[in-house]
Structure formats: C-alpha cells, structure tokens
Amino acid sequence: MKQNYSKGEIINANLGIPPKEIKGHEQGMERPCVVIKSFNNLELAIVVPLTSKEAKYSLFTIVKILKATAGLTADSYALCHQIRTISFDRITSKRAKLDNKDILKIHSVLIDTLEL
C-alpha cells in the first residue's frame, strides 16, 4: 500500500550522501524534513529540511521549531532556503506533525524567500 503525506508532517528523508549526491551547501544525509506540499499521485513531496545545529549567522529563512511542539528529540531549525522536491522513495519514515503555528511561520517565510 502506498503511503500518503500531508502538509506539516515531519518525515525522515535520505537527501543524499556527500560528495557524490550533494553539492556545495546543500543539506544531505538522512534527516527530518517538513512536508510543505505532497503530490501523492506523483509520489513527490516538496520539503524543507530540518537541522538541530543552531546557525552561527542569522537568516530570515530559518524558522526555529521547538522539540516540545513537534515531537522531535531536539530543538530544530527549518532551513526554508533549502526547499526541494523529493521522490517518496527518499522518505524513510513519518515522525510527527507540526502544530499550525509552526506551519504558518514556515509558510510565511517561504512566501518571503520565494518572493511570492
């Protein structure tokens, strides 16, 4: 049975192994990501990768996600400047669902980042 995903779900995804599958500052390895949009019939999802490493610099494209509100093991940061489309084949598991407040924060930052 094929899996379906929805906006705001936190999933684990294999984003590639450096250096062969990752270039420059792209996020890689298996990591949690937030589903922004799922195209279930195409088995594709637009995701924002998460990291637990606090940035050494301030970017308006980074949204802090508290572990208590997201079912994560550590406070994390949504890297909205790293948005990408992935195949469902890259998704290894579902983790949790973001609360509406965090989904709206990410949505707002994506509007600014993508100049929509």
PLM regions: where:
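Short, charged beta-turn/beta-strand-edge "cap" motif at the junction between a beta-strand
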Residues: 16-20
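Compact nucleic-acid interaction/catalytic patches
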Residues: 22-30, 35-69
